Amino acid sequence: CRHAKGEPVEYALRAAGLGLAEIGFSDHIPAEEDGFDDWRMLRSEFPEYLEKVAQAKREVPDVTVRLGLEVDFLEGEGATEWINELSQLADFDYLIGSVHYIAPGWDIDNPRWIGRWSGEAEVEEIWSAYWQIYHRCARSGLFDIIAHPDLPKKFGFTPSGDLRRYYEPTVQAALDADLAIEINTAGWRKDCAEQYPARTFLEMMHSAGVPLVISSDAHAPEEVGADFPRAARLALEVGFTHTARFCGRRRQLVPIDPTLAEKADESER
């Protein structure tokens, strides 16, 4: 995508160097019309993305390379058909559903629009709009995983009150749709300084039996695997014992390695 750096081969080499068993590539899906925004690949670049991931598979045999897409859930005429069309162009291992836009031209995690978070009423309005779309994303039946659930907290803005009012419908939707949800470590690198999603959300996931994926959301090779020990420790503390992996859009549960979590303790000494 146009807000990342490096080539898939570099990411795969980093994963291999860290001793990771596999790495998944999940570039943002191109929009049906070029010019939709300035941070995703163009339609014409989609075949190049597929080839570069295939190249990483060939050139870095020490790590399993999975092919995915992060799919912005956009509502409107033809949106679902476009997702289905692109998803048939390769043998994807997984599709991740995400929400960035709550209105045309307004991607809420874009620093360009930070001035719109001007007060408590605006924060509540943005969060409410986001989660309504996110619930529909989870229930759409299009995806295997849903990404960074509480993304609206990226800049540190959260509404007052019990946030479980937003979390509960999403956890139920994920359970009903048989989706996995990620711990996304990128949140620790943002203003919110907290993983996506919050611990309370993770606890609700575990209680409901929703599977977990751990993701670094790397946009540079050096971010591959970032804070994985910390995420593994958190997952184990909440009660998770396995994470989900995907191959050919089929899910497999793999035990969390407790020695990975121990590395988080070592780094804090």
Positions of predicted regions on the chain:
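Extended substrate/RNA-proximal surfaces in nucleic-acid metabolism proteins
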Residues: R43-A177, T259-E268
